[in-house]
Design a protein with these regions (language model features):
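N-terminal small-residue-enriched
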Residues: 2-103
Length: 103
């Protein structure tokens, strides 16, 4: 069976979906904190995007690759999509670049 979800570092609080099966309600199993856990996607998640594997509280760091990639702007529950609607990047907003807005 091919792996559809990756957690890149044990400190991460997100997983990366590498499957076209990112529909709301899809279930994935992976080892988190040494235990096999099942996650149900709370919404459709595109290939290559992230979802939470632990609760992430507003203001908490979002961790991928073992490093902070941003700060949660809202509470994020396990299985929820983690993207620009609920995280402020540590590196700026590439989607705003070139629009006369602060990146």
């Amino acid at each position: 069976m091919r792996q559809e979800v990756f957690v890149l570092d044990p400190r991460d609080n997100v997983a990366t979906l590498v499957s076209e099966n990112g529909k709301k309600g899809a279930k994935f199993r992976l080892v988190v904190d040494g235990a096999q856990q099942e996650f149900t996607l709370a919404s459709d998640i595109p290939f290559g995007h992230k979802f939470a594997i632990r609760p992430i509280f507003k203001g908490a760091q979002v961790t991928k690759y073992g490093f902070s990639i941003g700060t949660a702007t809202a509470e994020i529950r396990p299985g929820e999509h983690v993207h620009i609607h609920n995280i402020e990047s540590n590196r700026g907003r590439g989607d705003l670049a070139g629009q006369g807005k602060e990146a």
